[in-house]
């Protein structure tokens, strides 16, 4: 899962949206630096990442990547799941329009920015102002996201080419998304994530 899915599942679970978004920027035990609700959100994010990586649908999808891009498949797939969530938001969350949800999420996350790592603050500067969460529905933007990550982290250069794997297996990936994401939503609503 990437930003949008983590925020969405956190909302369904009444968890800290701030903690769920911040988690990738926090190493080790967060309890000494953040309030309990944010810490719980960080741990929820970590549980979701571990669970998602082990879902049969996700393990199967990783095998569709070419040898040269398979190493970065988990990262690429996380971005792709956000694409499908953004694209199908009106079906997935008909009572909470995407624009309204994004405004709500932004307001929640903004409360922790003064005490956040600089890299997280920098991400937030772009995430909201450049409307990444809305733009995830556009495959050209997904390609830009993957290229941007490859540019920032040269050891992940294969992300650039992984877009072709997404394109080649688009329909099958979308089908897998519909297999597992509604289950995760139900688990979040039951606070079982």
Swiss-Prot record:
GO biological processes: fatty acid biosynthetic process
Keywords assigned: Fatty acid biosynthesis, Fatty acid metabolism, Hydrolase, Lipid biosynthesis, Lipid metabolism
Keyword Iron annotated: no
GO molecular function, a single term: [acyl-carrier-protein] phosphodiesterase activity
Signal sequence, start to end: none
Catalytic activities: holo-[ACP] + H2O = apo-[ACP] + (R)-4'-phosphopantetheine + H(+)
InterPro entries assigned to the protein according to its UniProt record, in alphabetical order: ACP_PD, ACP_phosphodiesterase_gpbac
Residues passing through the membrane, by range: none
Domain of life: Bacteria
E.C. number(s) listed in UniProt: 3.1.4.14
NCBIfam families recorded: PRK10045.1
Biological role: Converts holo-ACP to apo-ACP by hydrolytic cleavage of the phosphopantetheine prosthetic group from ACP.
Protein family membership: Belongs to the AcpH family.
Protein name per Swiss-Prot or TrEMBL: Acyl carrier protein phosphodiesterase
Species per Swiss-Prot/TrEMBL record: Salmonella arizonae (strain ATCC BAA-731 / CDC346-86 / RSK2980)
